[in-house]
Amino acid sequence: MTAAVELEALPFELRPELEAHEPPEARGAARDDVRLMVSRTGVAELSEHRFAELPQLLLPGDLLVVNNSATIPAAVTCTTPQPGIGSVTVHFSTAMPAGDWLVELRSGSGQATAPLRGGTGGRRLELPGDVVLTLTERFSQRLWHARLSTAVIPYLLRHGRPIRYSYVPRPWPIEAYQTVFATWPGSAEMPSAARPFTPRIVTALVSRGVSIAPVTLHTGVSSLEGGEDPYPESYDVPAATARMVNLTRQTGGRVIAAGTTVVRALESAAAAAGRAAGGLAAASAGWTSHVVTRQTGVAVVDGLLTGLHEPRSTHLWMLGAFADDDLLRRCYQVARSHGYRWHEFGDVHLLLP
């Protein structure tokens, strides 16, 4: 897929009152105290639940595949204001195969930042800790290849803060942006579909006979913008997970992906190994620019647990691989009219075959 492809978006307005401004814990609730909408292919009626009911909605023999990437505090504000701009914040997005990083420059600091389209190759930005970030070449209208004068992840763990957008009015510690499965640091933004999982939900799933297997995909900043080419993300599908996926499918179980990142990892690995046509998962690791859409289809994933996505988000492309337009339109109409909450601290949607 290239930038020439138009967004197949669901036309709707996301009203501010539908944005989740804080995690459930802020109101004294548990992480798993969010709402869960369930849709099924070929079934007109939707069902609405609490997330704690998830174990009863999956079947013994199903496999839940989760992303064990941990969120890094990927935002850092430059120490020296830029002429004509003022404060500049750097969002570290993606580690690249050559050792550099894709970064997004944003004007402002803290919550009130906006994309900054300027910049020139060779520009040096001074960061806290006497560290220098050098822009090397432009990747897209908003992203730059850049190199840091020290190792990136250890630096961010010491000096960075979680990326936060305007709909979240106050800062939260990095722990609020980690899932229960987080193991390997690398995601600029939380693989948020798995945020509602808690140890009690995991225990209930296993007791139900649902297996759980990990993949790793380090996700970058936000959804692609219109006209923007996909950027590569690092992924790893272990051999044990690929075997579990194939065994589940062979024995009649369903493979459920906890998040769009899991779908991308599994489908990228199958395609890289030339096994997608046979519906077989494969062990693979590397970088992927694969975008899953209705046109590409899905080869090894049967269902998807995901958050609610913004209008014109490219994540909606992927939902088209699991449901037709009428079903998706109905889901999003119900979500808006019933007061579901969007974004990383919000409610979730389970798409089943």
What are these regions (language model features)?
Residues 1-353:
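A cross-family signal for N-terminal binding/gating loops and helix N-caps
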